[in-house]
Amino acid sequence: MEKVDKLKLKNDWKQRGYSFGVFRDPPGQVWANFVHKTDELVVLAEGEIQIEIEGRSHFPKIGEEQFIPAKALHTVRNTGRTYNVWYYGYKTILEFD
């Protein structure tokens, strides 16, 4: 299992115009039915996670980036038996048409 380089990821997201935050969730934790005005990125660092986006389930592996588009209904679940750690970032640079 490859470890996620937190500092490298944070710097990469900053370059791409995203914020950076960390969640550590207990087994069974559910963040249900969220919608944001901006795009979001999620990367699992430890444990297991399920990300449901507009009714479609994704099970990213550690280090795999998951994109959640702006205005998409989404739910995040810790599906494992241990705490998980995941990084999230919101698009901070506004793009104009």
Map each language-model feature to its residues.
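Extreme N-terminal tail/first-helix region
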Residues: 1-13
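Conserved short histidine dyad/triad with adjacent acidic residue
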Residues: 6, 19-36
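Short histidine-centered beta-strand/loop micro-motifs
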Residues: 10-12, 30-36, 77-79
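Short strand-coil-strand connectors
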Residues: 16, 52-56
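A generic "binding-loop/recognition-motif" signal
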Residues: 27, 37, 56, 72-73, ...
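Short, conserved beta-strand element in jelly-roll/cupin
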Residues: 35-51
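Short acidic-glycine-tyrosine-enriched beta hairpin
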Residues: 55-70
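Ligand-binding loop in jelly-roll beta-barrel domains
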Residues: 70-97
